């Protein structure tokens, strides 16, 4: 695997020098300062690429070129935004950047309720609490019809939880959910959030798939023409939330994508922490079935709690993800490619590390502090080395 590291640009508290010292050789970044839908010019791409290369690193993956909400709702200037997206892909290819991670999650990107969940050892993790989320949706957001998405017990628990919340608790929960997490391109006020949700009131899973198919049929041929590999990121969490459909959550969704646009430019980001939240997702089977189309991996683990829809981010080698078998399947796919004459390594980044040690005293991007990811990268690197030596050394 090619070891990479997510970097949020010049304002990231984790520097490129830190990234290099961590042992990564590739950088995963994006032009976050360019508004959604606007073209990334060759000049802007080259500026960022030069900064990365001056640090002795390579810009390996774009994460992400965000998709304008008009494209997802198939309204407004969606065709203009698609044309702009096509041009951005051409410009990236012109600059020698060929792997693009993206997602098709409506309104929200990845979602958590607690950004400072304290673990028994004193480090902090990200957590999604189903009951707190229900309390937000039922009693703060007050989304019409939300009760239908929860069991009677969850509704009762959410009411009790809400009754114990201080105003600061409510504000923090709201902020965590709607204000935008690292990598998310949108942040909202509560009223704006309600308005954006309303734009999806007539869009179910089938309709959102139609809009995604329209996007794929417009984008993938351009990507293929210029040599760009599109790697869709799964939904996080991988299930419908807030009445919004989710369409990249299961192996069936992956199969639908391949059947909709059967091009090798139409590929996947294997995010084990996102797919792994669902007990019915067999990560190793996903890798084996779609290995030739896996162009990027996010390696992390989560741990489901008593309510299986509640989870927190576990250490990289613990939790519900069998990281050994996942890494072994990825390495096997790389060796399959090598046997066919390709030296195409799969970029991997350690995803969402715990906030720990000295980082507990620093302001960090949630999930993206340095030391927790350094630990995760070192652990995964060790797993890969052991697998390479045990099964593939001559």
Swiss-Prot record:
Keyword set includes Iron: yes
Gene Ontology biological process: D-glucuronate catabolic process
Pfam name, any one: UxuA
Enzyme class name: lyase
Catalytic activity line of the entry: D-mannonate = 2-dehydro-3-deoxy-D-gluconate + H2O
Entry's EC annotation: 4.2.1.8
Keyword rRNA-binding attributed: no
GO terms assigned for molecular function: ferrous iron binding; manganese ion binding; mannonate dehydratase activity
Pathway: Carbohydrate metabolism; pentose and glucuronate interconversion
Cofactor: Fe(2+); Mn(2+)
Function comment: Catalyzes the dehydration of D-mannonate.
Similarity-based family: Belongs to the mannonate dehydratase family.
Protein name as catalogued: Mannonate dehydratase
Record organism: Salmonella paratyphi C (strain RKS4594)
Gene: uxuA
């Amino acid at each position: 695997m090619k070891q990479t590291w997510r970097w949020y640009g010049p304002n990231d508290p984790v520097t490129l020098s830190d990234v290099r010292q961590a042992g990564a050789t590739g950088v995963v970044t994006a032009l976050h300062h360019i508004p959604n839908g606007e073209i990334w010019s060759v000049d802007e791409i080259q500026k960022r690429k030069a900064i990365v290369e001056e640090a002795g690193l390579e810009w390996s993956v774009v994460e992400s070129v965000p998709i304008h909400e008009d494209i997802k709702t198939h309204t407004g200037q969606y065709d203009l935004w698609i044309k702009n997206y096509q041009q951005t892909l051409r410009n990236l290819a012109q600059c020698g950047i060929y792997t693009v991670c993206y997602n098709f999650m409506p309104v929200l990107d990845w979602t958590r309720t607690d950004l400072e969940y304290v673990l028994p050892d004193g480090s902090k993790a990200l957590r999604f609490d189903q009951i707190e989320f229900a309390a937000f949706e039922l009693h703060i957001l007050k989304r019409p019809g939300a009760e239908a998405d929860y069991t009677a017990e969850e509704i009762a628990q959410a009411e009790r939880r809400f009754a114990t919340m201080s105003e600061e608790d409510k504000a923090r929960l709201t902020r965590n959910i709607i204000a935008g997490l690292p990598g998310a391109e949108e942040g909202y006020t509560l009223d704006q959030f309600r308005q954006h949700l309303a734009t999806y009131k007539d869009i179910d899973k089938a309709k959102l798939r139609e809009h995604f198919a329209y996007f794929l049929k417009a984008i993938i041929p351009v990507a293929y023409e210029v040599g760009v590999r599109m790697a869709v990121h799964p939904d996080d969490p991988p299930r419908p939330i807030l009445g919004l459909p989710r369409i990249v959550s299961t192996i069936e969704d992956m199969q639908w994508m391949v059947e909709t646009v059967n091009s090798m430019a139409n590929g996947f980001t294997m995010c084990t922490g996102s797919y792994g939240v669902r007990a019915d997702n067999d990560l190793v089977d996903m890798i084996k079935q779609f290995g030739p189309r896996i162009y990027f991996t996010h390696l992390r683990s989560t741990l489901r709690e008593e309510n299986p829809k509640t989870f927190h981010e576990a250490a990289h080698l613990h939790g519900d993800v069998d990281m050994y078998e996942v890494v072994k399947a990825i390495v096997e796919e790389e060796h399959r490619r090598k046997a066919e004459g390709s030296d195409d390594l799969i970029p991997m980044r350690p995803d969402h590390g715990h906030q720990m040690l000295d980082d507990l005293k620093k302001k960090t991007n949630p999930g993206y502090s340095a030391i927790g990811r350094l630990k995760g990268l070192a652990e995964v690197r060790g797993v890969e080395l052991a697998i390479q030596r045990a099964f593939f050394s001559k």
